Amino acid sequence: MKHLEIELKILLKKDEYNRLKDQFTGVTPVLQTNYYIDTPDFELREKKVAMRIRTFEDWAELTLKVPQSVGNMEYNQKLQLKDAENYLSKEELPQGLVLDELAKHGIQSKNWQVLGCLTTLRYEIKTAIGLMALDQSRYFDITDYELELEVENHEQGKQDFRQFLEKNQISYQKAPSKLVRFVKSMKNS
């Protein structure tokens, strides 16, 4: 499956996260783990694309993100959890949509490497302004907090997101993606 993901995000302080969590009452959090994948020579990063296997309690998904003028085109391939665990341990990828799309970008590696993992506890709720996700993520010795808003229209979404943040007394500052934060921390550890 493929779809255009237009997402706005902000890193939060722990107290901001705790305040916002009150707005997610009744929402059961989902634990998800992202395993970031690249070639040994970082061919994906060089081409500005990102790939991960994300595991949930009883299923998994292989995702390729390709930047567009606005947002990322996301290619998702659903996996059985046991198959995902097998691919991760062997550092192999399944045939299908993601490998086909990589080939279109001139990437036909058979050499994959799992860079590491980032685990997120996510509260997600559909709001009038878009799909909102409140995340607490752990990677290496870091815990960070993030608010994401997935929208249909970037400009309207930006306006709505800023109003939401203002109403909640949080100043907007664009946040790097989880992968960028993970890789930066990987270099520092």
Name these PLM-found stretches.
Residues 1-189:
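Phosphate-end processing signature that detects enzymes handling 5′-triphosphorylated RNA
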